[in-house]
Regions:
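Generic structural signal for secondary-structure transition and capping sites
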Residues: 32-33, 57-58, 80, 131, ...
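Predominantly a Rossmann-like dinucleotide-binding segment in NAD(P)-dependent oxidoreductases
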Residues: 1-34
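NAD(P)-dinucleotide binding in Rossmann-like oxidoreductases
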Residues: 39-45, 54-124, 133-139
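Short amphipathic alpha-helical segments at helix-loop
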Residues: 4-6, 103, 129
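Internal, well-ordered alpha-helical segments in soluble enzyme and binding-protein domains
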Residues: 17-23, 46-48, 118
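Glycine/small-residue-rich pyrophosphate-binding loop that anchors the diphosphate of NDP-sugar donors
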Residues: 12, 48-50, 111
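C-terminal helix-rich "cap/oligomerization" subdomain common to oxidoreductases
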Residues: 124-164
Length: 164
């Protein structure tokens, strides 16, 4: 499988952890420092912990292709947390849980398929020739790619495509 093949620039960071990176960068922007601690088997990271440092707080992103556990995404703060029990690329049933136990649930997904809203935004961007939105999303993608590249290179994960 390409996800586990260094010949195809695979691995957990490149595959499953990309969703976490998009999520965190979308919320907080570019981190100040990036570290990745992979578990390497047969020349590929089958899982790993990515730590993104934002000076005042840290984000820990776990991506694993070698095991399975219940999905849990938490953003913890002084007054409570934001909890999502679905993959970050769908963010269904986002719960704001305050320290006093008060819970508010949000679900902005209007469609059964998580991709519908994204495709509708693409269509809207194209039809309205919204170059500002286009470049904003491009900048986001470039930061995500930079985070991913720095993380794997600092962890010593080098692909053949890096050498050529």
């Amino acid at each position: 499988m390409p996800a586990f093949d260094p010949e195809f620039s695979g691995g957990a960071l490149m595959d499953i952890n990309i969703y976490n990176i998009h999520y965190v960068v979308g919320l907080f922007g570019k981190p100040k420092n990036i570290e990745y601690y992979p578990n390497i088997e047969k020349e590929i990271d089958t899982s790993g912990i990515l730590i993104l440092d934002y000076d005042r707080f840290k984000c820990v992103c776990v991506g694993a292709k070698d095991c399975k556990s219940p999905i849990a995404n938490n953003i913890q703060g002084n007054n409570g947390c934001i909890y999502v029990d679905t993959p970050v690329n769908s963010c269904e049933n986002l719960k704001v849980i305050m320290n006093d136990g008060t819970t508010t649930v949000f679900n902005e997904n209007k469609y059964d398929n998580r991709m519908v809203s994204e495709f509708m935004e693409f269509i809207d961007t194209i039809h309205n020739n919204d170059l500002e939105r286009c470049y904003k999303m491009l900048d986001h993608s470039l930061i995500v790619s930079e985070v991913q590249t720095i993380a794997r290179k600092k962890a010593g994960i080098i692909f053949k495509s890096d050498i050529n």
